[in-house]
């Protein structure tokens, strides 16, 4: 009742301001209408992702956002386990004005922390309405609760995959020395690492080179250790589950065909010295430091997971020690569907809490970020500084481009370009604005412009223009009707959450044990792992989650 009453008062006041006023025009400029207010205001914000480059909106983009909206964010970003911090926020009753909880939205909804944004969007957010169009139905929370609690910011609208930022990574120098061989299977990938280490066991300073390292620090274990078992066996990224495309039934992916063999390969890499012995004990900063040292030949990660380490290499001019992305599968019998289209996933995003003193100002702020002006500002920066317009086309000047490539951390902190992507709704790659320019810089010509000489040399050897050319095209696969199940929220009081935590703990313990075991011990550990999953109730969890997948399909497609 507290939430409803507070919202009603604010909405009534806002509607009274609108009385007798017209909308003015059909323009999508964000600061239109009689309730536009750009007086200085600070909104508190919590984000479940870390953000090392956050500069308190004192970057160029942030200052312009404040100029246009009057809003400054007093932001806190997660530095450790965001789930624990969000649980504390939910229990406290003291919420930030804006919150981006990622997969823990259910905790806040159950606590009554979140405002239903449906009427706010309808009355005050023309750009958000325009952006999502007929896909706005996907913003609904569930079949039972059609409220809109967040503006999706982690999933772009109408985009296509131009960027291959995942797969298996290899240093350019290693691939070059191997003669640019075909790299399609785990064996191909292993061969490049092995041959390079045999010739170069140490770096120029006598430090031992590392064949491959993994990041098993907390949730990173899913990205670099466990998810690849599904991806290399043709089960596109659905988090901890494999979804049968014919029945929409969920199976904990560790119980599916081929995954034992993947972890057996990791065990082989560990026991032959090609996998870093510290992979399962190092922290994230130690992982990044190894990448930055240039001694790690191979990675299995998303580019955002190791980019800070790679940026240090670029800043030092060591471009041949940075990484290319390869479509690697367990064997030739599998087809890589890592980039199978999810369609618009909705899901994770930014919401307004019941603690917000002025929800209208908050939604207008989010509406500006979703506007054409706001998106261009975030993606490109300031005209005349981070880009120019030549013959009607946005162009990044050469000196700016060099900073983006070789001094990216400092450039991002100063410019703010890209820092606000996960705070505002946005179009995806390949979508053009009203001037005929692409919203994002991720279109083929600009992607190529962003590549280092080492990347261009490697790609040329493979007769490819971009890394995506080395992967099967998303058009080869149907769009997944459930999107991606890792962004399906399960109510916090559902028993499957308890089971999911149990099987997660088992997996995070048993998989490293299996990888680090002696080869002759692997089968026994694997069999014990599978039995422990059953004992923990994994089958009940699968059945329960299947219902949520099928509900998602119904919610989105009927």
Which residues are covered by each model-predicted region?
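Conserved N-terminal structural module of periplasmic/extracytoplasmic solute-binding proteins
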Residues: 6-10, 21-188, 200, 233-242, ...
């Amino acid at each position: 009742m507290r939430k409803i009453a507070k919202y009603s008062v604010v909405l009534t006041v806002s509607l009274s301001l609108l009385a007798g006023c017209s909308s003015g025009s059909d323009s999508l400029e964000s600061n239109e209408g009689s309730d536009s207010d750009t007086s200085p205001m600070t909104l508190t914000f919590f984000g479940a992702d870390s953000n090392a480059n956050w500069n308190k909106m004192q970057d160029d983009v942030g200052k312009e956002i404040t100029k246009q909206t009057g809003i400054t964010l007093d932001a806190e970003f997660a530095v450790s386990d965001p789930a624990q911090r969000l649980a504390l926020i939910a229990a406290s009753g003291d919420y930030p004005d804006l919150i981006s909880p990622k997969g823990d939205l259910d905790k806040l909804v159950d606590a009554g922390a979140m405002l239903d944004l449906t009427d706010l969007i309808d009355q005050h957010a023309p750009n958000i309405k325009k952006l999502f169009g007929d896909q706005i139905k996907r913003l609904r929370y569930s079949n039972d609760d059609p409220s809109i609690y967040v503006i999706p910011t982690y999933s772009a609208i109408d985009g296509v995959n131009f960027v291959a930022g995942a797969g298996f990574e290899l240093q350019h120098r290693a691939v070059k020395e191997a003669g640019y061989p075909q790299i399609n299977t785990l064996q191909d990938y292993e061969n490049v690492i092995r041959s390079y280490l045999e010739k170069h066991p140490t770096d120029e300073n006598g430090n031992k080179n590392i064949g491959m390292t993994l990041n098993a620090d907390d949730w990173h274990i899913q990205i670099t250790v466990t998810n690849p078992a599904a991806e290399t066996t043709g089960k596109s990224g659905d988090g901890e589950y494999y979804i049968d495309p014919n029945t929409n039934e969920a199976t904990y992916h560790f119980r599916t065909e081929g995954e034992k063999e993947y972890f057996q390969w990791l065990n082989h890499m560990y026991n032959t010295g090609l996998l870093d012995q510290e992979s399962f004990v190092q922290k994230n900063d130690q992982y990044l430091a190894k990448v930055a040292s240039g001694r790690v030949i191979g990675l299995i990660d998303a580019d955002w997971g190791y980019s800070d380490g790679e940026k240090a290499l670029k800043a030092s001019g060591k471009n041949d020690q940075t990484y290319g992305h390869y479509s690697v599968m367990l064997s030739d019998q599998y087809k890589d569907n890592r980039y199978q289209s999810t369609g618009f996933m909705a899901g994770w995003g930014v919401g307004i809490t019941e603690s917000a003193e002025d929800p209208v100002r908050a939604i207008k702020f989010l509406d500006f970020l979703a506007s054409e002006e706001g998106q261009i500002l975030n993606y490109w920066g300031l005209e005349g500084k981070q880009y120019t317009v030549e013959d009607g086309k946005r162009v990044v000047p050469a000196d700016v481009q060099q900073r983006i490539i070789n001094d990216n951390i400092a450039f991002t902190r100063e410019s703010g370009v890209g820092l606000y992507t996960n705070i505002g709704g946005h179009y995806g790659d390949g979508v053009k604005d009203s001037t005929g320019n692409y919203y994002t810089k991720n279109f083929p010509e600009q992607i190529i412009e962003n590549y280092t000489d080492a990347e261009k040399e490697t790609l040329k050897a493979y007769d490819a223009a971009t890394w995506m050319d080395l992967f099967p095209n998303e058009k080869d696969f149907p769009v997944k009707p459930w999107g991606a199940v890792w962004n399906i929220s399960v109510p916090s009081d559902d028993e499957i959450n308890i089971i999911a935590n149990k099987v997660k703990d088992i997996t995070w313990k048993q998989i490293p044990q299996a990888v680090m075991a002696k080869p002759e011990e692997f089968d026994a550990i694997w069999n014990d792992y599978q039995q422990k999953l059953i004992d923990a109730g994994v089958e009940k969890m699968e059945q329960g989650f299947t219902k949520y997948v099928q509900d998602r399909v119904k919610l989105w497609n009927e």
